[in-house]
Every structure is written in C-alpha cells, then in structure tokens.
Amino acid sequence: MAAKAGSDQPWLADAAAELAGQSGAVVDVVSADGVDLEAFSTVPRSEAAEPAERAATAIAERIRAAGVKATEHTLSGPVVRSVLLFAEEHDADVIVCGGSTRGAVARRLLGDQSIQLIRRSRRPVLVVTPPR
C-alpha cells in the first residue's frame, strides 16, 4: 500500500484494512521520500524522509488498530519507481493507493502518481478515492 508523504489518509488506511481483513492478507505500507538524486536536492535525504516516515507509520498504526497485520517501510527515491520496485521485490498481490486530491489543472501540471502507478505497474493497482 502506498502512503503519500506529508499527507493524512485515514480513508485509505481503512480501505486497505478492510480489504486485507477480508482476504487475510498482511499489509506493507510504503512511503517514498521523493528524492531522485540526493546530490541535486536542496534538502538532506533525512529531512525529506521524515514526512514519508510519518505517513507510513500513521497508516500502519491505523491498519493494526483494525486488527490487521501491517508493517511500514520508508523508501528512498522517486515515489512511483520506489513503490513499483518494492512491489516487485516483495511479490505484492495488489498495490493500493489513494486517488488524487488535486484539482484537474494541478494534476495536469504536476502529474498524478496513481495514474503513473496504473500505467507502469505489472501488478493490479487499486485506487481508493477520498470521501466527498
């Protein structure tokens, strides 16, 4: 399950917990720092990793509170590439991610990571939209 760094996504945690609870799955919650090349970053990797670590921990704790086994992982590197690599290395059954909360113009200008996951993944991707 992909957690967005610096974001609070309880609705995503609840959906993942429900899915895992029904199937008996274990959830690996991953969040990436988004730093591509540390040498060119204006922020030290340790600072960039903090929001990712907080997001993964918060979601994993919420999933565990629902009675589902969950482990959090903070990854280094671009989000989409890091999530896809983790999914391949750990033979994930499905990648669960949140739908974009950005407006249409922002998605067009900045991109949409859930769309990129769908396009690039060889595994099923479940996109959970935020409640209205």
Q: Which stretches of residues belong to each language-model region?
A:
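Structural beta-alpha unit
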Residues: 61-95, 115, 132
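Small/aliphatic-rich secondary-structure junction motif
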Residues: 1-42, 46
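Solvent-exposed polar/charged
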Residues: 18-21, 85-89, 119
